[in-house]
């Protein structure tokens, strides 16, 4: 819950511990990509993307992807950031539009489509299937 760390302590309490863990894993020749998810870190995402040594930065649904494209380290992959609430039945009216918007914005970047903070118990499984179909058929 990165947003709970005051900005002046984010490097010390958020970035440095992550970088230490990532560096240890990489020194052990771990070949799998390492994903960091500094939930609601706001503008601290910029320094996190450059200093944490993660291979992929997962973004929650509050991050504007156009901002991310301009500010996040372009050498790492971005993952995210569909609002999980859009999978809830009464909030799914704009689901396809939201998914396509994310895909359109990120189409020329290293990107993994994902929900911006996991599925909630009240999400509709048909909406999850719909998202999968949209992503699979996106051109």
Which sequence ranges carry the predicted segments?
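Active-site loop segments of alpha/beta catalytic cores
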Residues: 1-139
């Amino acid at each position: 819950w990165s947003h709970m760390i005051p900005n002046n302590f984010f490097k010390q309490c958020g970035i440095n511990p992550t970088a230490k863990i990532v560096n240890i894993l990489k020194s052990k020749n771990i070949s799998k990509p390492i994903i960091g998810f500094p939930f609601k870190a706001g503008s601290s995402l910029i320094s996190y993307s450059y200093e944490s040594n993660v291979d992929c930065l997962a973004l929650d649904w509050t991050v504007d992807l156009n901002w991310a494209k301009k500010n996040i380290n372009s050498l790492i992959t971005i993952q995210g950031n569909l609002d999980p609430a859009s999978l809830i039945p009464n909030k799914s009216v704009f689901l396809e539009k939201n998914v396509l918007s994310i895909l359109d914005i990120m189409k020329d970047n290293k990107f993994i489509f994902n929900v911006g903070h996991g599925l909630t118990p009240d999400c509709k499984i048909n909406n999850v299937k719909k998202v999968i179909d949209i992503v699979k058929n996106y051109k």
